[in-house]
Amino acid sequence: MEIAISYKPNPLISSSTQLLKRSKSFGLVRFPAKYGLGATRKKQLFRVYASESSSGSSSNSDGGFSWVRLAQSIRLGAERIGEKIGESVKTEIGFDSEEASGRVNEYVARVKDSVHKGHHELTRFKNETVPSFIDWNKWEHWKDIRNWDGKRVAALFIYAFALLLSCQRVYVAIQAPRVERERRELTESFMEALIPEPSPGNIEKFKRNMWRKATPKGLKLKRFIEAPDGTLVHDSSYVGENAWDDDLETTEGSLKKIIGRNARIQTEAKKKLSQDLGVSGEIGDSVGNWRERLATWKEMLEREKLSEQLNSSAAKYVVEFDMKEVEKSLREDVIGRTSETEGTRALWISKRWWRYRPKLPYTYFLQKLDSSEVAAVVFTEDLKRLYVTMKEGFPLEYIVDIPLDPYLFETICNAGVEVDLLQKRQIHYFMKVFIALLPGILILWFIRESAMLLLITSKRFLYKKYNQLFDMAYAENFILPVGDVSETKSMYKEVVLGGDVWDLLDELMIYMGNPMQYYEKDVAFVRGVLLSGPPGTGKTLFARTLAKESGLPFVFASGAEFTDSEKSGAAKINEMFSIARRNAPAFVFVDEIDAIAGRHARKDPRRRATFEALIAQLDGEKEKTGIDRFSLRQAVIFICATNRPDELDLEFVRSGRIDRRLYIGLPDAKQRVQIFGVHSAGKNLAEDIDFGKLVFRTVGFSGADIRNLVNEAAIMSVRKGRSYIYQQDIVDVLDKQLLEGMGVLLTEEEQQKCEQSVSYEKKRLLAVHEAGHIVLAHLFPRFDWHAFSQLLPGGKETAVSVFYPREDMVDQGYTTFGYMKMQMVVAHGGRCAERVVFGDNVTDGGKDDLEKITKIAREMVISPQSARLGLTQLVKKIGMVDLPDNPDGELIKYRWDHPHVMPAEMSVEVSELFTRELTRYIEETEELAMNALRANRHILDLITRELLEKSRITGLEVEEKMKDLSPLMFEDFVKPFQINPDDEELLPHKDRVSYQPVDLRAAPLHRS
């Protein structure tokens, strides 16, 4: 915008051209001509056009007063003054104005250059970049999508993003009025909900809250106003009196009830009073909007403030402190502040309990707080003492005994001091102390263990270093002393073993007596001998006998010593064989070898090392033992014993390591008699001792069991006050062991009391039932040995008969078809005897007999000896090839009831035939039992009377009584068939084959 102004020149002033030419020299600082004030203006806002006549200028051109000269003089004076001021400034402060002007001019030149370059770039952008950009964005280039390059794809994403952003901004702009309206509405609603009604009750609540914020908890202030007569009147409405009493605050509902129950107040007065108290409950009672309520609040608070000021001038106050509340409030504040610091200060104080801290007076402590010299304070648990830590100075820590000051915590918080609480009774301090001491404890433990390890290592090194020196001293603990000939013979007589034991003993004695005859011919003799068998059969006794017989060194150990000893098992194995080789020829005996050579020994690292050391010693390789295989030093025989040979590792028992296997089984009847003689030697035996009569009751006994039997018989004889051991003592011990296993052992007096409490009819029924079993058992020529029968054993209302299998049946290890049939017949004896004596009114006391009969009948049906179903697969095994033997020495293997055997799939006809065969066996044996008892009724009655009189009868007594009664015996069901080689007659021939063809037909119950 340009404005043209025409004016007439003042005749007192020279021409404007000259004035303008000299005007650029005004100022305190002198600038170069090219950087004058007029040169810096690019665009003038005002243009002034002036015109003057030439006469005006020429009229004053001669000498005399002139305004131009005056202006020039003033300008020159100003320039000189500016130069002097600049020189003085430069002299005083070192500021050079000319240098500063040069720098400013240089900066201005740079700015002009930058502006010029920017103008050039802007022109280039308008003339080149914009047209090329418009050409690049033409539709002809965009519609050919196949020829798009990466720039065009990126530009598409940028355009899309810009479009979305623009849409979002447009949407925000469109929604801005609505959002602003909602914000205002929300603000209005919030303020409406925030500012309550200015009722007296709300005013009272507000005053209480302000009082609680301004004063500590527990402080109560009572006000007394001075009346005109000079007396003090208690003002109960003062807020300081009940500000902390929450229960005094009356709820709106209770106020309504109080006003409503008052009959002296009229209805209108009640409404007005409710409105004044703010409990009217009507929604329309709100005093305007929140702005009006806020104004009302301000007016009411001003009135309350003015009223308080007026009352306070003529009032007196009484201050009361509830010390319990003050302490409780202080504790809550300290605990709340402590939770932020995590108890680090208190932990530091508790760890440095031993440090001396001087006491600081409480007033000095407050001064230190005011001067911000305190860094942290730690309250004790009883809030009576402070541990103060200063920011600087010496000492840094003090102890302050504090009173119960309600303003103390506020003062501490205002000072910005760290607060903590020392809780000595809480366990987490001890845990933190323990964690702090744990590294030191671990270091001490590591040093101790290192010292122990070094000590153990040095001991092992010394042991290996001086092994040769101490071997012989240790060898005395392993090598049994060699006895003379008489001792050897006596030891030989004490050993009662059968089989190939003595043949093996002779073979070993021949080798150990002259091993050179084998070494000269490069013959490797037996390396290891494995003794196996049930416990107590004499395996260890055989090893001792071998040592006694040979008179050679005998190194012995138990398998448990290699796993439970302090020395490693591998070292002990190497030590044993080293001692044996130094004293070769010698024996090495290890009992319970399965402890170190079992199948699972390799799973344990310690047992695996022991096992590998044993294998290396048995192999006898020179690289491992240092001794050639064919050397006299290798004349060592390894003997081991175990009760479980099937549990040994296969690598251990292979040939070359274990070359001989010897099974030492249970002794037979003859050997048991001999063992009884060995163990009863030196004891006082009565003349009636005949162990041969009781040998059938010791089937399955080992040598150790017989030794225990003799010892128990001796103890019983001493208990009875006898000096000799009688036959009855041995019988009593056998009965005691049997009845203890059944849990029915009683003393004689207790047994008599129990028998007297049972009725005669009950005893007679039990006697008849048991006599039936006894009679049928003795009618078979080769039935099990009958030990004894007893009524009411242990006081129970039952009877028991004890039978032992015969020796030949036990030796053969299997049962026969006839044996099972005999067992069924004898099992029928109890119920059949009741039917013979009492008729068909049979009791249910034979439940166990029926179960046994059914089980045996099923075994007979599925037995291969069955005439009709012997070749039919009626059962199948699950997961097992061989079934183990039955426990308790039973000869009948109940395969049907075995958990790993299940019935095979049968057709309807085979199932029916199975049932018929089962029933047939039961009925046939029952018929045999009934016929035998009817034919031998006199024997049945005799045995019944004996049981009623004595309550006990032995098998020998039954045999003696039956000899004179001419019993009708059964045929022998288990008599073996014997062939006489001298008899030239043909073998007996049966027209009826053992296996009849199966008669399969549909049963009536299964026909359709």
From Swiss-Prot:
It is a multi-pass membrane protein. This is ATP-dependent zinc metalloprotease FTSH 12, chloroplastic. Its main location: plastid. GO terms for biological process: protein import into chloroplast stroma; proteolysis. It comes from Arabidopsis thaliana (Mouse-ear cress). The chain crosses the membrane at residues 154-174, 427-447. Its cofactor is Zn(2+). It is an enzyme of class 3 (hydrolase). Its EC number is 3.4.24.-. InterPro entries: AAA+_ATPase (IPR003593), AAA_lid_3 (IPR041569), ATP-dep_Zn_Metalloprotease (IPR050928), ATPase_AAA_core (IPR003959), P-loop_NTPase (IPR027417), Peptidase_M41 (IPR000642), Peptidase_M41-like (IPR037219). Binds 1 zinc ion per subunit.
